[in-house]
Structures are given as C-alpha cells and as structure tokens.
C-alpha cells in the first residue's frame, strides 16, 4: 500500500503529482509504469540532542525532489501546522533538523518524495517526545514576528513598497489571503498581545480581517504615498456581537476585500504580536 498527503492542503492535491493516473493505469489497466518502493524513516537525536528525521527513500536514482515537513506539539491532526524543513543528503539517507521549543512535547515529521515520472510518495508519519529519546535539547524560540516576506500567507506574491520595504501582495481578489501558522507554538500570540502590521496602498480600499473564520472586523485601508500601520486588539474582532477573547486562541487569520474593493492593490508587511 502507498499514500501521499499534501501538507497544509484543504481537499486540494495539486502538489501530489500524477499519482491517480499512474496508479490506475498500473494496477487496473496493467500498464508497466514505474512505482517506487516505500521509504524508511525514523526520528533520532543528533550528537547535541537536537531531534532530526533520518529518511531513506527507495529508488534514489529516480528522485526528482524531496521535501521534509515538521509539526510541533499538537496531536490533533486537524489543527497541525506543517513547516517546510531543509534536509541534507548523507549517503543514502536524507537528514533534516527538527528544532523544538519543549523537549517534553511531541514533534511530528514526514516527507514527500517526488520521482521523475511525477509519482509522489509520503513517508511514514513519525511522532516522538524528544526527551524520551535521550538528553534532548530545545533550540527553537518563540517569534513575535509573524511574517518575513510572504511568510505563510496563501495566494500572495512578494512585493516591495516605498523605501524598499519587502512585503506581500494578495494575488486573488476573490479569495483574499489566509495564514494558518498560529497553531504552531512558535507563532502563537502571547496572551493579551495585539496584532500589528504595516500596509502600503495609494488607492483607498476596504477589507475584512477575520480570525478562526468567525471573528471579523472591517478595516479602512486609507491611501497614502508612505507606509501606514495598524494595531488591532483581539476584542475588536466580533462574532455575533461577542469579541475575540484573546489573540492567543486564534489558529488562523484571513484578509478579504469588501465588495467593490481590490485587495491586490494593497502591500502588507511586518505582521507581528505587540504588547
């Protein structure tokens, strides 16, 4: 048996190659398509106590690309935020560092392996508590800066505003943009913090910012030839008249245009948590 899972996917499979056609033609029609063997994987501690994924794929001469993913803490697969992780090949094994913030919390990891014929396989899902493996160390740190460049915002492209400040511009005026990285403890808001960001727009626009899809607030993006900033307390976002209790309970943030506005004309930058 085999499987492939798209990280951060939502019923979409565009990053899973040509699996369906290849599998059906091979196993139903009997055509002679190449199909790789199962990869082997395990999470270990390195010599300094940092967790790392050791991945040994099959049919390595046919590999086109390989991407490792990591998730911290939550055992609820619906709420997981999967980070992209760099890996280094060491002989027949790819090794990826998995930095953690707490050695007594779970770390999860798996990889997607794309082959030359556009078949994509996922490795097994590995889950460990690092302290159970030995003398583990926590090397990751919490970040109040949410977005550097495009960050994890969906449907955006890199953009530069006045003064050379790097940010992002939403590309789809119908879908807007969304960020789901806040279930990761690295980017979860500190209690009683506020959301701050900068924006650059030379034409006035109106947008709706929401948290967890339910709590919303209307924002006026005023026109200016300079960067502007905005700071939002959690209670400003409402759902049926009730304010968001705290930014720390937010797992996702979305920004959508109001009817008649064009969000693609707005450049956003430097989303961060502030006191």
Identify the function of each model-found stretch:
Residues 104-118, 251-256:
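Short, aromatic- and glycine-rich surface loops/edge beta-strands on solvent-exposed regions
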Residues 87-92, 101, 220-228:
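Short proline/glycine- and polar residue-rich coil/turn motifs
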Residues 118-150:
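Short beta-strand elements
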């Amino acid at each position: 048996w085999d499987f492939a899972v798209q990280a951060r996917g939502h019923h979409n499979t565009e990053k899973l190659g040509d699996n369906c056609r290849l599998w059906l033609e091979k196993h139903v029609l009997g055509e002679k398509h190449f199909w790789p063997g199962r990869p082997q994987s395990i999470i270990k501690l390195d010599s300094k106590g940092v967790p790392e994924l050791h991945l040994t794929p099959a049919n390595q001469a046919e590999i086109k690309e390989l991407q490792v993913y990591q998730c911290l803490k939550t055992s609820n697969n619906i709420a997981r935020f999967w980070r992209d992780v760099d890996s280094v090949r060491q002989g027949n094994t790819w090794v990826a560092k998995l930095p953690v913030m707490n050695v007594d919390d779970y770390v999860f990891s798996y990889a997607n392996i794309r082959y030359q014929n556009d078949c994509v396989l996922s490795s097994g899902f590995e889950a460990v508590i690092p302290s159970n493996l030995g003398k583990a160390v926590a090397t990751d740190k919490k970040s109040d800066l949410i977005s550097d460049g495009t960050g994890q915002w969906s449907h955006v492209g890199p953009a530069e505003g006045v003064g050379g400040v790097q940010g992002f511009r939403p590309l789809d005026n119908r879908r807007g943009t969304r960020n789901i990285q806040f279930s990761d403890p690295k980017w979860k808001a500190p209690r009683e913090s506020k959301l701050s960001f900068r924006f650059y727009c030379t034409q006035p626009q109106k947008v709706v910012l929401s948290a967890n899809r339910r709590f919303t607030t209307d924002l006026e993006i005023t026109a200016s030839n300079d960067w502007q900033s905005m700071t939002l307390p959690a209670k400003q976002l409402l759902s049926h008249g009730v304010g968001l209790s705290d930014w720390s309970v937010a797992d996702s943030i979305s920004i959508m245009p109001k009817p008649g506005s064009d969000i693609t004309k707005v450049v956003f930058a430097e989303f961060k948590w502030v006191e």
